[in-house]
Amino acid sequence: MKKYYAESELIINSDGSIFHLHVKPEQLADKVILVGDPGRVALVASHFDTQECEIESREFKTITGTYKGKRITVVSTGIGCDNIDIVMNELDALSNIDFGTRYEKDNLRPLQLVRIGTCGGLQPYTPVGTYICSEKSIGFDGLLNFYAGRNEACDLKFEQAFVDYMGWEGNVCIAHPYVIDADKELVNRIAQDDMVRGVTIAAGGFFGPQGRELRIPLADPRQNEKIEKFEYEGYRITNFEMESSALAGLARLMGHKAMTVCMVIANRLIKEADTGYKNSIDGLIKKVLERL
């Protein structure tokens, strides 16, 4: 029996668009690029051959158009896994729920989603300017723990090895990390020889959760030192960002394909940073557009 989605659960605006994004079902392409910064949406769309719609609501900006015959939607998510929860659920609803009847569609429509972002490198081989594909993500955010099917989707052995190594077992103050794979086919298509594949930590904040200490001391001053040295079955943690785990995890549970690729704009180990990255990230955008 198909599930009915009440008005309180699936909020549809009076114009037929989804609540936060303000996008209508017919405005969503099968191929989706996600960016954090609303200003980066225009940069991606500047490469489109045609443009059919442009919508802006809060931090969520959406443009749908075509690139070399491929219909693509680019959406800004803002910062953090909490926003990814909003964006992914609303994109999935646009794709797989009939807004007229409020029932799930008979034929589900899988999306291909690539997040293009920036990150902090954690290894000597990930200097500023490196493109890192998140083959696996470790979620510090705890978001996926609220959804059924979490254990079946995640790499539980990797999770336990990481928790044991960090000394976090039994620490009720920390959301239990989850480890999730990006879609392998999408990774193989996007992450070619010009990109590093690695394990990404999606942190729940920019400062303390990523080991940055300003006026408040860290609960674990050795956090980053331990993270940089962690290894499991040949995997090393390559970078910090704030969205990849929720994207890969929710996509897996919903039946979509998703991955994250980021440009390193700061290396925490080498202690270098580039604040003028906004021009150079265009090269990464072009690569994703060609391969998506």
Regions found by a protein language model. Give the residues of each.
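Metabolite-binding pocket within alpha/beta catalytic cores that recognizes anionic/polar moieties
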Residues: 1-178
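Intrinsically disordered, low-complexity segments enriched in small residues
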Residues: 20-27, 204-210, 282-291
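Structural signal for hydrophobic packing residues in well-ordered secondary-structure cores
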Residues: 48-52, 92-95, 99, 190-194, ...
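Glycine-rich beta-alpha junction loops
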Residues: 120, 137, 201-208, 246, ...
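Short pre-catalytic strand/loop immediately N-terminal to key active-site residues, enriched for Gly-Thr
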Residues: 234-238
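Short glycine-rich, acidic/polar surface loops and turns
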Residues: 240-256, 261
